[in-house]
């Protein structure tokens, strides 16, 4: 005979495991998207400027070209120099 309490617990644990697996998969997918869109060191530290039609800013002529995020670039550069100084004093 099947115990209803035991069945409910097993079903609850199964649902919890599925939710955790789904969350892990979603987190990994977001992490991969973040890595691809904000790569470091290979010329991909740029941000897309919104187009003029969408009400975005009117910086550098908005022809779809990528524009460097200078603050982020300076941060990466400073971190790199600091890391090199620590590795090779």
UniProtKB/Swiss-Prot annotation:
Sulfotyrosine modification, residue list: 80, 82
Prodomain residues: 23-79, 85-89
Glycosylation sites: 42
Localization in the cell: Secreted
Keywords, comma-separated and alphabetical: Developmental protein, Differentiation, Glycoprotein, Growth factor, Secreted, Signal, Sulfation
Signal peptide feature range: 1-22
Superkingdom to which the source organism belongs: Eukaryota
Chief location bin: secreted
Transmembrane segments: none
Residue numbers spanned by region Disordered: 33-68
GO BP: cell differentiation
Expression sites by tissue: Expressed throughout the seedling. More abundant in fragments containing shoot or root apexes where cells proliferate vigorously.
One GO cellular component term: extracellular region
GO molecular function: growth factor activity
Reported modifications of this chain: Sulfation is important for activity and for the binding to a putative membrane receptor.
Protein purpose: Promotes plant cell differentiation, organogenesis and somatic embryogenesis as well as cell proliferation.
Family affiliation: Belongs to the phytosulfokine family.
Note: The N-terminal tripeptide (YIY) is the active core.
UniProt name for this protein: Phytosulfokines 1
Organism expressing this protein natively: Oryza sativa subsp. indica
């Amino acid at each position: 005979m099947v115990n209803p309490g035991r069945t409910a617990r097993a079903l609850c644990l199964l649902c919890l495991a599925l939710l955790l697996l789904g969350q892990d998969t979603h987190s990994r997918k977001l992490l991969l998207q973040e890595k691809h869109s904000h790569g470091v060191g290979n010329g991909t530290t740029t941000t897309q400027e919104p187009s003029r039609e969408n009400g975005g800013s009117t910086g550098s002529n908005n022809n779809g070209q990528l524009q460097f995020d200078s603050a982020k670039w300076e941060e990466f550069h400073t971190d790199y120099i600091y890391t090199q100084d620590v590795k090779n004093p």
